């Protein structure tokens, strides 16, 4: 679970909510039969034999796939019976066997970001997504004016060498998130997908 739009502003929640997942494994994964759920009573069983996500691929699960209604999001699969609270909620992806594949519990801005019209997105797919500190607010505008990167790298400018040394995540801000990503790169070898922004001293070495 890589990005969550729980509270769109350009359209109503009933048509504009979406969830982005990414396949961080090395194998194709068939999502048919998997369950989208929260800790209450909302569940949706994915029913599509062709819904296969390849290694490194992003996929958008959304409440509506009409671009003219949903804020301009290309949705890969439409779910029903599952809604995202604007305050706190859970997004849980469950294997047909009952095993939890992934889960995120966001918390009304206590540790997770929570801004109207902006998705909350994982800083790096290699980070633990159950920790709010590893998420940030989207800064890229899409569709009708909300902010997010549905179906794309959360920081699409990471591969552009723009001289912003130290801006590890390429979001044009210099803050603690850059420090967290740099330390994570050193200790856990999960580095940002960029070519130059992590080069703090401009020596072309990372």
Where are the predicted features?
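Activation on beta-sandwich/Ig-like modules and their edge loops
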Residues: 1-132, 138-147, 152-158
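Cellulosome-associated attachment modules in secreted, modular CAZymes
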Residues: 150-206
């Amino acid at each position: 679970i890589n990005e969550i739009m729980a509270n769109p502003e350009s359209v109503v929640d009933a048509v504009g909510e979406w969830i982005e997942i990414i396949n961080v494994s090395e194998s194709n994964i068939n999502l048919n039969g998997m369950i989208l759920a929260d800790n209450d009573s909302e569940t949706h069983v994915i029913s599509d034999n062709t819904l296969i996500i390849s290694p490194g691929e992003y996929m958008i699960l959304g409440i509506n796939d009409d671009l003219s209604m949903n804020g301009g999001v290309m949705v890969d699969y439409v779910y029903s019976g599952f809604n995202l609270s604007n305050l706190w909620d859970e997004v849980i992806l469950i294997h047909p066997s009952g095993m939890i594949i992934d889960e995120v519990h966001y918390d009304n801005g206590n540790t997770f970001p929570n801004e109207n019209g902006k998705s909350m997105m994982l800083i790096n797919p290699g980070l633990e997504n159950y920790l709010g500190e590893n998420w940030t607010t989207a800064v890229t505008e899409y569709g009708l004016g909300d902010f997010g990167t549905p179906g794309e790298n959360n920081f699409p400018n990471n591969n552009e060498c723009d001289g912003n040394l130290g801006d590890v995540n390429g979001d044009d801000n210099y803050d603690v998130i850059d420090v967290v990503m740099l330390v994570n790169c050193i200790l856990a070898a999960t580095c940002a997908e960029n070519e130059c922004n992590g080069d703090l001293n401009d020596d072309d070495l990372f």
